[in-house]
A protein has these predicted regions:
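Nucleotidyltransferase catalytic core that binds NTPs
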Residues: 1-140
Length: 140
């Protein structure tokens, strides 16, 4: 039986931090499922100017990456319902979530599922990249 690993996020403006997270997540099991927030979900989380890339574009980008086996788009604010549906063996999150209680981690801990927190590149963030681009354009 294969070991299903699940990771989720916006993955808007794919960057090195995302790649590192996905590579480390794939090392944890046999089959990596990536849940991505829908366009409307990102708008609610990040603001009206987001996402930069629509969900189908982001899905295709992620599927082109070697560690990714499957991508599922979800429209809720969190991935809890998707986790209940796919029943992963391992859930991987960035270490920035280590001290946060989330509906996903609460649910998985009750089921005694493994949660792995991965260190990430602190200087890589889609939001920070967008801010840098705006700042550079303002100076031009």
């Amino acid at each position: 039986m294969r070991c299903k690993v699940f990771v989720n996020g916006c993955f808007d403006l794919l960057h090195l931090g995302h790649i590192e997270l996905l590579n480390k997540a794939k090392e944890c099991g046999d089959y990596l499922i990536v849940g991505i927030n829908s366009n409307s979900s990102i708008k609610n989380l990040k603001g009206p100017s987001r996402p930069i890339f629509n969900s189908q574009y982001r899905k295709k980008m992620l599927l082109a990456l070697d560690p990714v086996d499957e991508v599922i788009i979800f429209s809720e604010a969190n991935a809890l319902n998707l986790i209940k549906k796919i029943k992963p063996d391992i859930y991987v999150k960035g270490s920035d979530y280590k001290n946060e209680k989330t509906p996903e981690t609460d649910f998985l801990l009750k089921l005694k599922k493994k949660i792995i927190y991965v260190d990430f590149y602190k200087n890589y963030s889609s939001t920070n990249i967008i801010a840098k681009i705006i700042k550079k354009n303002d100076k031009a």
